[in-house]
Amino acid sequence: MADTFKESPIKSVQVEALVVMKIAKHCSSSFPTIATGSIVGMDNDTLVEVTNSLNFPTVDVANVDSHQSERDASAQAAAAPRSKANLMYQAEMIKHLREVNVDANCVGWYTSATMGNFVTMSFIENQAHYQRENPKAIALVHDVSRSSQASLSLRAFRLSTAFMTALKENKFTTENLQKTKLTYKDILIEMPVVIHNSHLLTTYLHQIPSAPAAGSETTIPTSLAALQREPVNIPPYPSIDSLELSIDPFLEKTCDLLLDSIEAHYTDLNNHQYYQRQMTREQAKITAWQAKRKAENAARAAAKQEPLPDDEWKRLFKLPQEPSRLEGMLNARQVEQYSKQVDGFTANVSAKMFAVRGSLLTE
Protein backbone atom coordinates (compact mmCIF):
# COMPACT_ATOMS: atom_id res chain seq x y z
CA MET A 1 0.00 0.00 0.00
CA ALA A 2 1.25 3.42 -0.88
CA ASP A 3 2.10 5.93 1.83
CA THR A 4 -0.15 8.54 0.24
CA PHE A 5 -3.71 8.11 -0.95
CA LYS A 6 -4.57 9.19 -4.48
CA GLU A 7 -7.84 10.88 -5.36
CA SER A 8 -10.33 8.35 -6.70
CA PRO A 9 -11.74 9.13 -10.18
CA ILE A 10 -15.06 7.44 -9.35
CA LYS A 11 -18.00 9.82 -9.87
CA SER A 12 -21.08 7.56 -9.99
CA VAL A 13 -22.27 4.03 -9.19
CA GLN A 14 -24.40 1.74 -11.35
CA VAL A 15 -26.19 -1.10 -9.56
CA GLU A 16 -28.00 -3.96 -11.26
CA ALA A 17 -31.69 -4.25 -10.36
CA LEU A 18 -31.18 -7.85 -9.22
CA VAL A 19 -28.46 -6.73 -6.80
CA VAL A 20 -30.80 -4.07 -5.38
CA MET A 21 -33.44 -6.74 -4.77
CA LYS A 22 -30.91 -9.04 -3.07
CA ILE A 23 -29.61 -6.26 -0.82
CA ALA A 24 -33.13 -5.12 0.08
CA LYS A 25 -34.22 -8.68 0.90
CA HIS A 26 -31.15 -9.36 3.05
CA CYS A 27 -31.43 -6.08 4.96
CA SER A 28 -35.18 -6.37 5.57
CA SER A 29 -34.94 -10.00 6.71
CA SER A 30 -32.17 -9.12 9.20
CA PHE A 31 -33.92 -6.01 10.57
CA PRO A 32 -33.33 -4.63 13.20
CA THR A 33 -29.91 -6.32 13.27
CA ILE A 34 -27.39 -4.73 10.91
CA ALA A 35 -26.91 -6.68 7.68
CA THR A 36 -23.64 -6.46 5.75
CA GLY A 37 -22.20 -8.03 2.65
CA SER A 38 -19.70 -7.69 -0.15
CA ILE A 39 -20.41 -6.31 -3.62
CA VAL A 40 -18.58 -7.38 -6.76
CA GLY A 41 -18.40 -5.94 -10.24
CA MET A 42 -15.98 -3.77 -12.16
CA ASP A 43 -14.81 -0.17 -12.32
CA ASN A 44 -14.97 1.56 -15.67
CA ASP A 45 -13.04 4.83 -15.50
CA THR A 46 -15.35 7.09 -13.48
CA LEU A 47 -18.13 4.51 -13.06
CA VAL A 48 -18.40 1.57 -10.65
CA GLU A 49 -20.65 -1.20 -11.95
CA VAL A 50 -22.09 -3.47 -9.24
CA THR A 51 -23.20 -6.78 -10.79
CA ASN A 52 -23.50 -9.13 -7.79
CA SER A 53 -23.58 -9.19 -3.99
CA LEU A 54 -22.53 -11.67 -1.30
CA ASN A 55 -24.22 -11.78 2.10
CA PHE A 56 -21.92 -12.03 5.09
CA PRO A 57 -22.94 -14.65 7.67
CA THR A 58 -24.11 -13.01 10.89
CA VAL A 59 -24.28 -14.20 14.47
CA ASP A 60 -27.69 -15.56 15.42
CA VAL A 61 -28.95 -13.69 18.48
CA ALA A 62 -30.64 -16.83 19.82
CA ASN A 63 -27.31 -18.66 19.84
CA VAL A 64 -25.36 -15.90 21.51
CA ASP A 65 -24.18 -16.41 25.07
CA SER A 66 -26.74 -15.35 27.68
CA HIS A 67 -24.44 -12.58 28.93
CA GLN A 68 -24.43 -10.98 25.48
CA SER A 69 -27.21 -8.64 24.52
CA GLU A 70 -28.77 -7.96 21.16
CA ARG A 71 -26.64 -4.82 20.93
CA ASP A 72 -23.51 -6.97 21.09
CA ALA A 73 -24.83 -9.08 18.22
CA SER A 74 -25.46 -5.93 16.18
CA ALA A 75 -21.93 -4.73 16.95
CA GLN A 76 -20.53 -8.04 15.70
CA ALA A 77 -22.64 -7.78 12.56
CA ALA A 78 -21.41 -4.21 11.97
CA ALA A 79 -17.78 -5.37 12.23
CA ALA A 80 -18.39 -8.40 9.98
CA PRO A 81 -16.91 -6.89 6.76
CA ARG A 82 -13.41 -6.75 8.23
CA SER A 83 -13.43 -9.97 10.28
CA LYS A 84 -10.93 -12.63 9.25
CA ALA A 85 -13.57 -15.35 8.81
CA ASN A 86 -15.70 -13.21 6.50
CA LEU A 87 -12.67 -12.10 4.50
CA MET A 88 -11.85 -15.76 3.88
CA TYR A 89 -15.50 -16.40 2.99
CA GLN A 90 -15.44 -13.47 0.55
CA ALA A 91 -12.24 -14.70 -1.11
CA GLU A 92 -13.69 -18.21 -1.48
CA MET A 93 -16.95 -16.95 -3.00
CA ILE A 94 -15.11 -14.67 -5.43
CA LYS A 95 -13.00 -17.65 -6.45
CA HIS A 96 -16.16 -19.61 -7.27
CA LEU A 97 -17.56 -16.68 -9.24
CA ARG A 98 -14.37 -16.47 -11.26
CA GLU A 99 -14.63 -20.16 -12.11
CA VAL A 100 -18.04 -19.63 -13.74
CA ASN A 101 -16.80 -16.57 -15.66
CA VAL A 102 -18.72 -13.96 -13.64
CA ASP A 103 -17.45 -10.51 -12.62
CA ALA A 104 -15.33 -11.34 -9.59
CA ASN A 105 -13.73 -8.05 -8.60
CA CYS A 106 -14.56 -6.80 -5.12
CA VAL A 107 -15.66 -3.17 -5.49
CA GLY A 108 -16.82 -2.55 -1.92
CA TRP A 109 -19.45 -3.61 0.57
CA TYR A 110 -22.98 -2.78 1.67
CA THR A 111 -24.72 -2.28 4.99
CA SER A 112 -28.21 -1.66 6.29
CA ALA A 113 -29.26 1.40 8.26
CA THR A 114 -32.24 2.61 10.26
CA MET A 115 -33.48 6.18 9.92
CA GLY A 116 -30.17 7.28 8.42
CA ASN A 117 -28.13 6.15 11.42
CA PHE A 118 -25.00 4.84 9.71
CA VAL A 119 -22.21 7.37 10.43
CA THR A 120 -20.51 5.26 13.10
CA MET A 121 -16.97 4.21 13.91
CA SER A 122 -17.67 0.70 12.57
CA PHE A 123 -18.77 2.14 9.23
CA ILE A 124 -15.62 4.28 9.01
CA GLU A 125 -13.32 1.37 9.91
CA ASN A 126 -15.01 -0.96 7.41
CA GLN A 127 -14.82 1.52 4.55
CA ALA A 128 -11.22 2.44 5.42
CA HIS A 129 -10.32 -1.27 5.32
CA TYR A 130 -11.76 -1.62 1.81
CA GLN A 131 -10.25 1.63 0.52
CA ARG A 132 -6.79 0.62 1.70
CA GLU A 133 -7.05 -2.47 -0.48
CA ASN A 134 -8.84 -0.72 -3.36
CA PRO A 135 -8.96 3.11 -3.55
CA LYS A 136 -12.07 2.83 -5.75
CA ALA A 137 -14.05 0.80 -3.21
CA ILE A 138 -17.48 2.13 -2.27
CA ALA A 139 -20.05 1.53 0.46
CA LEU A 140 -23.74 1.08 -0.34
CA VAL A 141 -26.12 2.09 2.47
CA HIS A 142 -29.67 0.72 2.34
CA ASP A 143 -32.06 2.45 4.75
CA VAL A 144 -34.67 -0.17 5.64
CA SER A 145 -36.99 2.28 7.42
CA ARG A 146 -37.14 4.73 4.53
CA SER A 147 -37.49 1.97 1.95
CA SER A 148 -40.48 0.51 3.81
CA GLN A 149 -42.46 3.62 2.78
CA ALA A 150 -42.44 2.61 -0.92
CA SER A 151 -39.40 4.77 -1.66
CA LEU A 152 -36.08 3.01 -2.23
CA SER A 153 -33.25 4.48 -0.16
CA LEU A 154 -29.91 3.29 -1.55
CA ARG A 155 -26.91 5.60 -1.29
CA ALA A 156 -23.23 5.23 -2.19
CA PHE A 157 -20.36 6.69 -0.15
CA ARG A 158 -16.60 6.64 0.07
CA LEU A 159 -14.11 8.29 2.40
CA SER A 160 -12.36 11.41 1.18
CA THR A 161 -8.63 11.35 0.52
CA ALA A 162 -7.96 13.99 3.19
CA PHE A 163 -9.81 11.96 5.81
CA MET A 164 -8.03 8.73 4.80
CA THR A 165 -4.68 10.49 5.26
CA ALA A 166 -5.68 11.79 8.70
CA LEU A 167 -7.01 8.35 9.65
CA LYS A 168 -3.72 6.71 8.64
CA GLU A 169 -1.73 9.17 10.76
CA ASN A 170 -4.35 8.97 13.55
CA LYS A 171 -3.94 12.68 14.22
CA PHE A 172 -7.34 14.08 15.13
CA THR A 173 -6.12 16.80 17.46
CA THR A 174 -7.33 20.38 17.35
CA GLU A 175 -3.99 21.64 16.05
CA ASN A 176 -3.82 19.08 13.24
CA LEU A 177 -7.44 19.64 12.19
CA GLN A 178 -6.85 23.40 12.02
CA LYS A 179 -3.68 22.85 10.00
CA THR A 180 -5.32 20.50 7.47
CA LYS A 181 -8.68 22.35 7.53
CA LEU A 182 -10.46 19.01 7.89
CA THR A 183 -14.11 19.26 8.99
CA TYR A 184 -17.00 16.87 9.44
CA LYS A 185 -18.15 17.72 5.90
CA ASP A 186 -14.95 16.20 4.50
CA ILE A 187 -15.45 12.72 5.97
CA LEU A 188 -17.77 11.15 3.39
CA ILE A 189 -18.25 11.76 -0.31
CA GLU A 190 -21.66 10.75 -1.66
CA MET A 191 -21.99 9.56 -5.25
CA PRO A 192 -25.15 9.25 -7.35
CA VAL A 193 -26.61 5.76 -7.73
CA VAL A 194 -28.17 4.57 -11.00
CA ILE A 195 -30.32 1.41 -11.16
CA HIS A 196 -29.59 -0.61 -14.31
CA ASN A 197 -31.94 -3.17 -15.87
CA SER A 198 -31.09 -5.77 -18.48
CA HIS A 199 -32.41 -5.25 -22.01
CA LEU A 200 -34.77 -8.21 -21.59
CA LEU A 201 -36.30 -6.74 -18.43
CA THR A 202 -36.55 -3.29 -20.00
CA THR A 203 -38.41 -4.78 -22.97
CA TYR A 204 -40.80 -6.56 -20.63
CA LEU A 205 -41.49 -3.38 -18.67
CA HIS A 206 -42.33 -1.51 -21.86
CA GLN A 207 -44.79 -4.25 -22.85
CA ILE A 208 -46.81 -3.84 -19.65
CA PRO A 209 -49.96 -1.88 -20.51
CA SER A 210 -50.13 1.46 -18.76
CA ALA A 211 -53.07 2.40 -16.55
CA PRO A 212 -55.86 4.31 -18.29
CA ALA A 213 -55.73 8.05 -17.84
CA ALA A 214 -58.36 9.30 -15.39
CA GLY A 215 -59.35 12.59 -16.95
CA SER A 216 -57.01 15.36 -17.91
CA GLU A 217 -53.83 15.87 -15.99
CA THR A 218 -53.96 18.66 -13.44
CA THR A 219 -51.54 21.51 -14.15
CA ILE A 220 -50.11 23.16 -11.05
CA PRO A 221 -50.17 26.99 -11.29
CA THR A 222 -46.80 28.66 -11.06
CA SER A 223 -47.92 32.00 -9.61
CA LEU A 224 -50.81 33.69 -7.84
CA ALA A 225 -51.83 35.44 -11.06
CA ALA A 226 -52.06 32.10 -12.87
CA LEU A 227 -54.15 30.70 -10.03
CA GLN A 228 -56.60 33.62 -10.21
CA ARG A 229 -56.76 33.50 -14.00
CA GLU A 230 -57.28 29.74 -14.35
CA PRO A 231 -58.67 27.96 -11.26
CA VAL A 232 -57.30 24.50 -10.61
CA ASN A 233 -59.53 21.69 -11.87
CA ILE A 234 -60.02 19.32 -8.97
CA PRO A 235 -59.60 15.69 -10.12
CA PRO A 236 -62.59 13.37 -9.58
CA TYR A 237 -60.56 11.15 -7.25
CA PRO A 238 -59.33 13.41 -4.41
CA SER A 239 -56.75 11.93 -2.07
CA ILE A 240 -58.28 12.44 1.36
CA ASP A 241 -55.36 10.65 3.02
CA SER A 242 -53.00 13.45 2.02
CA LEU A 243 -54.96 15.80 4.30
CA GLU A 244 -54.23 13.71 7.38
CA LEU A 245 -52.84 16.01 10.08
CA SER A 246 -51.10 13.38 12.18
CA ILE A 247 -47.36 13.91 12.48
CA ASP A 248 -45.27 11.43 10.51
CA PRO A 249 -43.92 8.80 12.95
CA PHE A 250 -40.64 8.81 11.04
CA LEU A 251 -40.35 12.54 11.72
CA GLU A 252 -40.84 11.93 15.45
CA LYS A 253 -38.24 9.15 15.49
CA THR A 254 -35.77 11.22 13.49
CA CYS A 255 -36.20 14.14 15.90
CA ASP A 256 -35.51 11.82 18.83
CA LEU A 257 -32.36 10.52 17.14
CA LEU A 258 -31.33 14.10 16.33
CA LEU A 259 -31.63 15.09 20.00
CA ASP A 260 -29.57 12.04 21.02
CA SER A 261 -26.83 12.98 18.55
CA ILE A 262 -26.81 16.59 19.77
CA GLU A 263 -26.52 15.35 23.35
CA ALA A 264 -23.60 13.10 22.39
CA HIS A 265 -22.00 16.06 20.60
CA TYR A 266 -22.24 18.24 23.73
CA THR A 267 -20.84 15.41 25.85
CA ASP A 268 -17.79 15.25 23.59
CA LEU A 269 -17.54 19.05 23.71
CA ASN A 270 -17.61 19.01 27.53
CA ASN A 271 -14.84 16.40 27.58
CA HIS A 272 -12.69 18.60 25.36
CA GLN A 273 -13.36 21.65 27.53
CA TYR A 274 -12.37 19.63 30.61
CA TYR A 275 -9.10 18.73 28.85
CA GLN A 276 -8.47 22.40 28.10
CA ARG A 277 -9.01 23.35 31.77
CA GLN A 278 -6.63 20.59 32.88
CA MET A 279 -4.03 21.73 30.35
CA THR A 280 -4.33 25.34 31.52
CA ARG A 281 -3.82 24.34 35.17
CA GLU A 282 -0.79 22.18 34.38
CA GLN A 283 0.78 24.87 32.21
CA ALA A 284 0.29 27.41 35.02
CA LYS A 285 2.06 25.05 37.43
CA ILE A 286 4.91 24.57 34.95
CA THR A 287 5.26 28.33 34.43
CA ALA A 288 5.38 28.92 38.19
CA TRP A 289 7.96 26.15 38.62
CA GLN A 290 10.15 27.55 35.82
CA ALA A 291 10.03 31.05 37.35
CA LYS A 292 11.00 29.63 40.73
CA ARG A 293 13.85 27.59 39.23
CA LYS A 294 15.07 30.64 37.32
CA ALA A 295 15.23 32.64 40.57
CA GLU A 296 17.07 29.77 42.30
CA ASN A 297 19.62 29.57 39.50
CA ALA A 298 20.15 33.33 39.66
CA ALA A 299 20.84 33.06 43.40
CA ARG A 300 23.18 30.09 42.84
CA ALA A 301 24.99 32.00 40.10
CA ALA A 302 25.52 34.90 42.51
CA ALA A 303 26.94 32.43 45.04
CA LYS A 304 29.13 30.92 42.26
CA GLN A 305 27.39 27.53 42.44
CA GLU A 306 26.39 25.13 39.66
CA PRO A 307 22.91 25.94 38.23
CA LEU A 308 20.12 23.41 38.58
CA PRO A 309 18.71 21.80 35.39
CA ASP A 310 15.87 23.71 33.74
CA ASP A 311 14.15 20.70 32.17
CA GLU A 312 13.39 18.89 35.40
CA TRP A 313 9.74 19.92 35.09
CA LYS A 314 9.24 17.20 32.45
CA ARG A 315 9.73 14.61 35.18
CA LEU A 316 7.64 16.40 37.81
CA PHE A 317 4.64 17.37 35.70
CA LYS A 318 2.63 15.30 33.25
CA LEU A 319 0.57 17.11 30.64
CA PRO A 320 -2.86 15.58 29.91
CA GLN A 321 -3.34 13.80 26.59
CA GLU A 322 -5.78 15.52 24.24
CA PRO A 323 -8.75 13.26 23.41
CA SER A 324 -9.33 12.40 19.78
CA ARG A 325 -11.77 14.69 17.97
CA LEU A 326 -12.85 11.88 15.61
CA GLU A 327 -15.95 10.95 17.64
CA GLY A 328 -17.01 14.59 17.69
CA MET A 329 -16.61 14.84 13.92
CA LEU A 330 -18.72 11.71 13.40
CA ASN A 331 -21.41 13.06 15.73
CA ALA A 332 -21.46 16.34 13.83
CA ARG A 333 -21.77 14.48 10.52
CA GLN A 334 -24.64 12.41 11.93
CA VAL A 335 -26.38 15.56 13.19
CA GLU A 336 -26.16 16.97 9.66
CA GLN A 337 -27.64 13.73 8.28
CA TYR A 338 -30.59 13.85 10.70
CA SER A 339 -31.13 17.56 10.02
CA LYS A 340 -31.47 16.93 6.29
CA GLN A 341 -33.99 14.16 6.98
CA VAL A 342 -36.03 16.40 9.29
CA ASP A 343 -35.97 19.13 6.64
CA GLY A 344 -37.35 16.67 4.10
CA PHE A 345 -40.02 15.31 6.45
CA THR A 346 -41.28 18.73 7.55
CA ALA A 347 -42.04 19.96 4.03
CA ASN A 348 -45.49 18.31 3.91
CA VAL A 349 -46.18 18.80 7.62
CA SER A 350 -45.46 22.54 7.47
CA ALA A 351 -47.80 22.96 4.50
CA LYS A 352 -50.60 21.21 6.41
CA MET A 353 -50.03 23.33 9.51
CA PHE A 354 -50.17 26.56 7.49
CA ALA A 355 -53.40 25.33 5.86
CA VAL A 356 -54.94 24.68 9.28
CA ARG A 357 -53.76 28.06 10.56
CA GLY A 358 -55.28 29.80 7.55
CA SER A 359 -58.62 28.09 8.04
CA LEU A 360 -58.75 29.04 11.73
CA LEU A 361 -57.94 32.71 11.30
CA THR A 362 -60.95 34.97 10.92
CA GLU A 363 -60.99 37.39 8.04
Curated annotation (Swiss-Prot):
SMART domains, sorted: JAB_MPN
Pfam families: eIF3h_C, JAB
GO cellular component: eukaryotic 43S preinitiation complex; eukaryotic 48S preinitiation complex; eukaryotic translation initiation factor 3 complex
Chief place of localization: cytoplasm
Superkingdom classification of source: Eukaryota
All residue ranges annotated as the MPN domain in the record: 13-163
ATP-binding keyword on record: no
InterPro entries registered for this protein in UniProt: eIF3h (IPR027524), eIF3h_C (IPR045810), JAMM/MPN+_dom (IPR000555), JAMM_MPN+_peptidase_M67A (IPR050242), MPN (IPR037518)
Assigned protein family: Belongs to the eIF-3 subunit H family.
Protein known as: Eukaryotic translation initiation factor 3 subunit H
Organism classification: Eukaryota, Fungi, Dikarya, Ascomycota, Pezizomycotina
